[in-house]
Amino acid sequence: MQAARIAPSLGRQLLRFGGGSSRPTALLGQPWPGPARRPYAGGAAQLALDKSDSHLSDALNKAKPAKAESKSFAVAMFKGQLTTDQVFPYPSVLNQEQTEFLKELVEPVSRFFEEVNDPAKNDTLEMVEETTLQGLKELGAFGLQVPSELGGVGLCNTQYARLVEIVGMHDLAVGITLGAHQSIGFKGILLFGTKAQKEKYLPKLASGETLAAFCLTEPSSGSDAASIRTSAVPSPCGKYYTLNGSKLWISNGGLADIFTVFAKTPVTDPATGAVKEKITAFVVERGFGGVTHGPPEKKMGIKASNTAEVLFDGVRVPSENVLGEVGSGFKVAMHILNNGRFGMAAALAGTMRGIITKAVDYATNRIQFGEKIHNFGLIQEKLARMVMLQYVTESMAYMVSANMDQGSTDFQIEAAISKIFGSEAAWKVTDECIQIMGGMGFMKEPGVERVLRDLRIFRIFEGTNDILRLFVALQGCMDKGKELSGLGSALKNPFGNAGLLLGEAGKQLRRRAGLGSGLSLSGIVHPELSRSGELAVQALEQFATVVEAKLIKHKKGIVNEQFLLQRLADGAIDLYAMVVVLSRASRSLSEGHHTAQHEKMLCDTWCIEAAARIREGMAALQSDPRQHELYRNFKSISKALVERGGVVTNNPLGF
């Protein structure tokens, strides 16, 4: 199991957490993004909008040379901008051939997990049965995204998400075995491997003949990548590296033959000649010799997956097995993790779908007080909230996968949000299922307690949710901070930057005055969702106002304001969730899906509550004295606990 790692300066490294992105930095003086398509706007309205956008774009184009701007909604929302390119309309990326191929896979994969795989038995044995592994190999499940010419199934991200959702619905431990293998284990070879590396390793990995593992965590390094101690020293001849060290809690660690390993290597600065230690990624074969593993770890959940310590003792790794460039290992690791997070959201959407089915089945058959319990308001609210969480998670997963399939390189914040939201939503949904089932839910036979145990790890590995919240907030604030810096420079030459100042500065002044910035989703969301669209825009403006105020106040020091950053991240998560469900429900309404009105209710209900949370959360952040008192109390209480070694207060009885 892997947690995302952060280097010594927490704030600085968090801003690199989206590593590997080729997204151009957002700069001031860029042209206004192309006019948003408003499928529900009348012709005259769209013409007026286009004309308005055109005038502003001309003004900005005259101000400074045009440069590409991020199309990420999440990046833009921190700046108070409504960038809809990647979120409206809800993306449909599969062509007819891809859709038909996927349909041919869904049925046999579903049937396999219903008829062959036994999750309860896997859990008891604490291993995946050999018949299951063999069946998965025959289905091609070990190489879903490996190109067909290299022996894989060749799926795009959206197709992969659909199959992962099936796995997550039935057995998370099997999902970890498959995910540790292909989502992170050999993903580096797919993303950064040379032609020779791909041809050498991917065919056997895709067939399942060999398994892969991702080796980053060490005993002394959890969320701090720079503290890894595993080293790789180049030989005098330059033909190989000698690898020494150990990696902890590695999924597939006791089964894998191929490892993506991260180690410190000496790197010489060509300009100064100074030698620094930097992280480098390697493809390591067990067959190189010197690679061993410890016994399987005893765990709370995902017991059927193999988790073990992996040790490297004088392993000679050929220089051609460097993955990416020497010294670029942090970038490689972060890119791998960023690239796979949508898959976790898809899997957990499947988990929730299965759990909700169990909850509904119980609620429709259990009779208490002479009534089936689904008729009681408390149960109805639980079921409604459970399915809202599933709908949001699923909407996020397929939004991000589609963005990736469309060629976006700027999805890091969205992917992190989907992982945070999905892992927390799945826990809540499963916990509520147990509550609905009462004592029966606590029993082993229904299998819900196993799912709850399996789920707990998802908030920890591939980036703990705490670290990812800091990343979401800091990455968003970084882009906004650059914009504020650019506005400051523009003010020094107001005549040369008139278009810019009239555009962005005007919006900011109106927002600060509570007048709104003129943003609207009118004509973009379906007319039946117009009120929810208005709530989303209001929430965005409230959120952006606070982001700007806190950046102006703290400047670079914001990296140390973790109490604040956590709350900004929560607002960002709610805001992104509002937009993805608005988009998905709009598509269902416009295409006349039979579930459209149900989706409208899910969307409206989510938006009402999310808007209220954002409004209350941002209002609290704006009342500085009270917030500062809270933060001081948190620090003081925590300090007292640490000094005491536990609870400070005595028992009320005094002994």
Curated annotation (Swiss-Prot):
Membrane topology designation: Peripheral membrane protein
Residues annotated to bind FAD: 214-223, 249-251, 464-466, 562
Active site, UniProt feature: 462 (proton acceptor)
Entries under Gene3D superfamilies matching the protein: Acyl-CoA dehydrogenase/oxidase, N-terminal domain (1.10.540.10), Butyryl-CoA Dehydrogenase, subunit A, domain 2 (2.40.110.10), Butyryl-CoA Dehydrogenase, subunit A, domain 3 (1.20.140.10)
Protein name from the UniProt record: Very long-chain specific acyl-CoA dehydrogenase, mitochondrial
Region (Catalytic): 41-482
Enzyme Commission number(s): 1.3.8.9
Annotated localization: Mitochondrion inner membrane
Cited function: Very long-chain specific acyl-CoA dehydrogenase is one of the acyl-CoA dehydrogenases that catalyze the first step of mitochondrial fatty acid beta-oxidation, an aerobic process breaking down fatty acids into acetyl-CoA and allowing the production of energy from fats.
Keyword set, alphabetical order: Acetylation, FAD, Fatty acid metabolism, Flavoprotein, Lipid metabolism, Membrane, Mitochondrion, Mitochondrion inner membrane, Oxidoreductase, Phosphoprotein, S-nitrosylation, Transit peptide
Positions with a binding annotation for substrate: 461-463
Gene: ACADVL
PTM note: S-nitrosylation at Cys-237 in liver improves catalytic efficiency.
Residues where S-nitrosocysteine is found: 237
Residues bearing PTM N6-acetyllysine: 51, 71, 239, 276, 278, 298, 331, 482, 550, 556
Modified residues (Phosphoserine): 517, 522
Sequence positions bearing N6-succinyllysine: 71, 195, 239, 276, 278, 331, 372, 482, 556, 639
A single GO BP: fatty acid beta-oxidation using acyl-CoA dehydrogenase
Cofactor(s) for this UniProt protein: FAD
Record InterPro entries: ACAD9/ACADV-like_C, Acyl-CoA_DH_CS, Acyl-CoA_Oxase/DH_mid-dom, Acyl-CoA_Oxase/DH_mid-dom_sf, AcylCo_DH-like_C, AcylCo_DH/oxidase_C, AcylCoA_DH/ox_N, AcylCoA_DH/ox_N_sf
Membrane-anchoring, as annotated region: 483-516
Organism listed in the record: Macaca fascicularis (Crab-eating macaque)
Subunit structure: Homodimer. Homodimerizes after import into the mitochondrion.
Gene Ontology MF term list: acyl-CoA dehydrogenase activity; fatty-acyl-CoA binding; flavin adenine dinucleotide binding; identical protein binding; very-long-chain fatty acyl-CoA dehydrogenase activity
Catalytic activity: a very-long-chain 2,3-saturated fatty acyl-CoA + oxidized [electron-transfer flavoprotein] + H(+) = a very-long-chain (2E)-enoyl-CoA + reduced [electron-transfer flavoprotein]; dodecanoyl-CoA + oxidized [electron-transfer flavoprotein] + H(+) = (2E)-dodecenoyl-CoA + reduced [electron-transfer flavoprotein]; tetradecanoyl-CoA + oxidized [electron-transfer flavoprotein] + H(+) = (2E)-tetradecenoyl-CoA + reduced [electron-transfer flavoprotein]; oxidized [electron-transfer flavoprotein] + hexadecanoyl-CoA + H(+) = (2E)-hexadecenoyl-CoA + reduced [electron-transfer flavoprotein]
